[in-house]
Design a protein with these regions (language model features):
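Solvent-exposed, non-transmembrane alpha-helical starts
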Residues: 57-69, 109-113, 142-146, 185-196
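Short, strongly hydrophobic transmembrane alpha-helices
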Residues: 4-32
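Membrane-proximal extracellular/periplasmic loop immediately following the first transmembrane helix
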Residues: 25-101, 109
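Mid-to-C-terminal secondary-structure elements
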Residues: 116-136, 146-206
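Glycine-rich loop motifs involved in handling phospho/adenylate chemistry
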Residues: 13-17, 138-143
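The feature marks short, hydrophobic/small-residue-biased sequence motifs that occur predominantly
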Residues: 87-135, 141-142
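Glycine-centered tight beta-turn/hairpin loop motif at sheet-sheet or coil-to-beta transitions
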Residues: 79, 106-108, 171-173
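Generic structural signal for small/hydrophobic residues in well-ordered secondary structure
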Residues: 1-4, 11, 32, 48-50, ...
Length: 206
């Protein structure tokens, strides 16, 4: 009798674990593929992550990321997409330009942050919730003006509040004007996740 109870308990626990695992996988799949803010148009988007160059009649090839010239002459010239937005990869930026540190003027605190470079169309393709200010404009992006958008947690950590549009911060000792502050986003939204966003040309130079 006791043995039957033991096996019954094992079956129940095993079934429960199996169901829980399937549900967890389904939830993760939904989060990674569904249209969830700020990635509200995943089902309509295409991504260009790398460029492959072939030479010697296709016998050799060279793979690389999308450089500024390719972006300007090819991607921005596409007519089929409704919008073309360009970003840097925040996860690999430390390997390309080194660690990124941000500091409020006069403060001794200089936390390391995850920074993403982007263009002005980024804010039209992705739907962020602005708590203060607004994204940097096209003219600011094209002229390379040092602008930055912070997430809520970083703004509060640096300046103690979220109403900070128009104030300045130092990113690797370069002064940036805060354009706006957005609600924190989940790291699950890996294509747009960062703590601060700057015009991408400046992002590479920081």
């Amino acid at each position: 009798m006791g043995q039957n109870r033991f096996f019954t308990a094992v079956y129940i626990i095993g079934t429960g674990l199996a169901i829980s695992m399937v549900m967890a996988i389904a939830v993760v799949y939904h989060i990674r593929t569904a249209n969830i803010a700020p990635e509200v148009s995943r089902d309509r988007m295409g991504y260009v992550l790398n460029v492959s160059y072939e030479f010697n009649g296709g016998k050799g090839s060279l793979n690389s990321g999308c450089g500024p010239r390719f972006v300007k002459e090819v991607l921005y010239g596409l007519e089929t997409p409704e919008k073309v937005a360009v970003t840097t990869n925040a996860a690999i930026m430390p390997y390309e330009v080194g660690d990124i540190f941000i500091q409020a003027p006069g403060s001794d605190e200089s936390p390391k942050v995850q920074l993403m470079g982007c263009d002005d169309a980024f804010w039209q393709v992705y739907r962020f919730s602005f708590l203060d200010g607004k994204p940097f404009a096209s003219a600011e992006f094209l002229s390379g003006m040092p602008r930055v958008v912070l997430d809520r947690s970083l703004a509060r950590r640096l300046l103690g509040r979220t109403e900070v549009a128009g104030q300045t911060v130092l990113i690797n000792d370069i002064e940036y004007t805060i354009s706006g502050v957005v609600e924190d986003i989940s790291a699950v939204a890996s294509d747009v996740y960062a703590e601060a966003w700057v015009p991408y040309k400046i992002g590479r130079a920081s």
